[in-house]
Amino acid sequence: MTDLDPPLRRYLADLVAAARDVLGDDLVGAYAAGSVGLGAYQPGRSDVDVALVCADALDLGRRQELVARLRHEALPCPARGLELVVYRREVARSGTPEPGFEVELNTGARMPFRATWAAVDRPARDGLFWYGLDRSILHQCGYALLGPPAAEAFADLSPADLRRLLTDALRWWLALPTPPGDGPAPGAEDAVLGACRSLVRFRHGVWLSKVDAGRRLIDDGRPAEATAGGAAADPTGDATDDLVERSIAARAGGPPPSGPEARAFQRQVLAEIAAEAA
C-alpha cells in the first residue's frame, strides 16, 4: 500500500497494534478491505474497512475491550469512519454465506456509532448479505496488514451463494425509499456504481472498485440485459453508458443521476443476475 496517504497508513498500524494489545496471540490476521483493498480509497469520502481474524471465539469482555480501544474516541479515524468486523479463523476459511462474525464496530467522526456483539444480534432489516460479499472481496482483494495472504485467510463463496447474496443486496437497496422527481439525487451515483460492481462480479468473476466496475461495464458494450419480468434494457447501450458516465463524474463533483434512473438500472441488473438462478 505504498500509495496510501500517511495518516491512513499510521492509523492502520495503530489499529493493528491496539488489537494485538487486546487479543494477543489470538489475533492471527488483520486485513484492509473495501476501498483500501480495491485501491480506490478517497480521503474525505471513503470509509476504512478492516477485518480482523482471531484464532478462537471471543468472550464478551474481550469484545467490549476491543471496541473500547478501537472506537473513534479512543483511536481517531482519519476517514469518514471505520467499519470493523472480527471473524474466527474457521469462519473466515469456511466460505459460508452467513454473517458469522464475533463483533462488529462502526465508528467515526461522520459515522453513527454502532457495536453489534454477536452475529445473531444483527437485524435482518439491516441486511445479512454484507458479510459473505465482504469476505468474497477480501479473498480476491484484501490487503494483509498482519497474517497470511487474504486469499488464504478467506474462502470465496460458492457460485450459488454469490448469486443469492448479490440478488439479496440489490433487493435490499431497491426496498429503500427512492428520491422523487427527475432532478439529481445525491447518493444515486453510488447506487448505480454499486450495481455495476455486482454485475461485473457476476459476469467476469472479479471484484473491482465502483468506478472501475462502471468503466468495465462501458467497455463491455453490453448493458444490463432485459429479461422476463425485468426492466427493459436500452437496446444500444447508449443510455446505460451515459448513466454510468454521469455516475462516475458525480463522484468527482458532477451532478448525480436521478433516483428513478438509478432504480431502473438496479432493476435491470437484478433481472440479469436473478435470471441465472431461475
Task: Describe each model-derived feature in a short phrase.
Residues 32-68, 72, 81-88:
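Catalytic metal-binding acidic patch
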Residues 166-209:
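Internal helical hairpin/lid segments
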Residues 1-31, 61-63, 278:
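Helical scaffold of the NTase/Pol beta-like nucleotidyltransferase catalytic core
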Residues 71-183:
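Conserved NTP/Mg2+-binding pocket subregion across the NTase superfamily
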Residues 206-230, 234-278:
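Structured mid-to-C-terminal alpha-helical surface segments
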Residues 8, 162-165, 191, 265:
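Amphipathic alpha-helix face/heptad-repeat signature
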Residues 17, 196-199, 214-218:
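Amphipathic alpha-helical segments within well-ordered protein domains
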